Amino acid sequence: MNAITMRPIAESIFSEKALGRVLWTDITSHIDIPSSNRSHMDGFVVKHSDITRISQYGPIKLRIIPKRKANRKNQKLLTGRSTRISTGEVMPLLGDTVIPLEYTQFGSKNHTITIQRDFPKGSFISYKGSEIARNDLLLSAGHVLRTQDLALVSVLGIRKLKIFKKPTVAIIPTGNELTNEINVAKGGKILNTNSRVISDLIEISGGKPLDLGITPDNNDKIKNKIRVALSESDIILTTGGSSVGVRDLVAESINDIGKPGILVHGIKLDRGRVTGLAALRRKPVIVLPGPIQGAANAFIVFAQPLIRVMLGLNPFTEPLIIAKLTEDWNARKKFQNFTKIVYVKISQSVSGEFHAKPITGETTDITVLTKSNGFIMVPERLTRLKRRQKVKINIFPGLSFSSGSSIEFP
């Protein structure tokens, strides 16, 4: 991390566009809510001293005075008097208790009411500042805004919010074999699905994807794309062209542009071992493998934490589910001392217990991802997981569920 600088940036946006965004500053209330004492029920306002005799002498009668429509809060309630009030209406001066309608009875010509029972002083009144007081801290910096938070902001009359700006993440897919055309892919080319997957993962992680398009295996063209990415984005991801032990044009291009260049090329991650990590102009460059599982794994381990740092969030999310494995799982022999990512299909029994079935396949198999809805991070020291063993399952937005749906475990 010494080779890069992750400096979050603030921006102001209208509150109606802020769902899911991260607050840059605290929000404190500049008003009291309620702004004055208000009735919590439909009924009659009384002075409590007028109804204390009910418990001893039974129901009492009070004279009804008409309510003043304007400046209700300046209307005084005198002894022996009562006035009608509606839910949410401002309390008149000296009125200190509300009697619900169902405990009153109108007298002749509706000039008086009979109150059937006593209520504690202050009953059915929402006092000034009882929900929110002036200078209360309501939302803290770093909070991810939910719909109820934005409703609160609206109540406070706040039109604009200062939030963490979404980091722009550039995607540079490389390789002569790639195409975006399905018909061309049928003729021997490889359909560029990685860009779609990585772009969606960037967006759902809180970043702003910038797809710079397929780049052929040409050193100068790769360098030009990287230079564009350096000027227009905060984080750069390349996909494909990453290998260890053979000529790697992406790594060469990165090193040609400047120092420090490639910092790590090849990591102990299964799948994703040919991932490269680099730095240029204090910006992180992640060289993702071409095979889809390796690319997704490297994104989870390296790219998403960087996006979260730029958003002022904890870089690592916690596992959300504890589940029992439905079958044994064994690490591949030559990768036993690697960190392993095991994709699983989570289901839930009638009793509510979660179960996880390991999903295996080739590193290029997109179906490993489509059949799964969670994954296990298996540390280097573990080479085997046993049936019925309890494991921590990571739930990753975009891979486990879409942003517009709930998590479902059939």
PLM features per residue range, with description:
Residues 1-9, 26, 48, 91, ...:
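Structural signal for hydrophobic packing residues in well-ordered secondary-structure cores
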Residues 11-16, 25, 38, 132, ...:
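Flexible glycine/proline-rich
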Residues 92, 147, 244-246, 294, ...:
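Short glycine-rich, flexible loops that bind phosphorylated cofactors or substrates
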Residues 1-58, 341:
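Intrinsically disordered, low-complexity, positively charged segments
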Residues 18-32, 71-84, 277-278:
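Short, hydrophobic/aliphatic alpha-helical segments
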Residues 159-288, 292-301, 409-410:
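Helix-rich terminal scaffold detector
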Residues 44-216, 227, 355, 360, ...:
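Short, glycine/charged-enriched hinge/interface segments at domain edges or termini
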